[in-house]
């Protein structure tokens, strides 16, 4: 229940010491938690309990909201106030990427959300149609339109430029 991943291993409060986990964290060096560790923790629980709500709470948890969302977690504290985005993300499922440089949520008839931590090219498969491409600042939730309308025929290669790592939202237009 109180286990979580850190950069140097797993945090687990000592048993039988009559201390609350927060007290135990003060006594030891708790370590740092990164996007990858938070993602891994939520993904493991989501896989083990697919029909349950999975929440995440650990050291610096508000900063890990995007990791929670991208791993399929419930109720992350992201700051995006776009109703269409929230509607789209609720329909999407996690798509395995086998890399820590980016994570994807996809529903082929709705679009995709890509969280990229480094520049490069990312392939996204969606249904044929017209889409818009938007960039979301992960810390502020500000939505910036990059391409108002373009056509996709199955495969779209998203190019992440240097210095523009973050959240990309590919939204299907009606």
Please identify what each model-predicted range represents.
Residues 19-147, 155, 159-174:
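Aromatic- and carboxylate-lined catalytic core of secreted/periplasmic carbohydrate-active enzymes
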Residues 1-26:
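Aromatic- and acid-rich polysaccharide-binding/catalytic face
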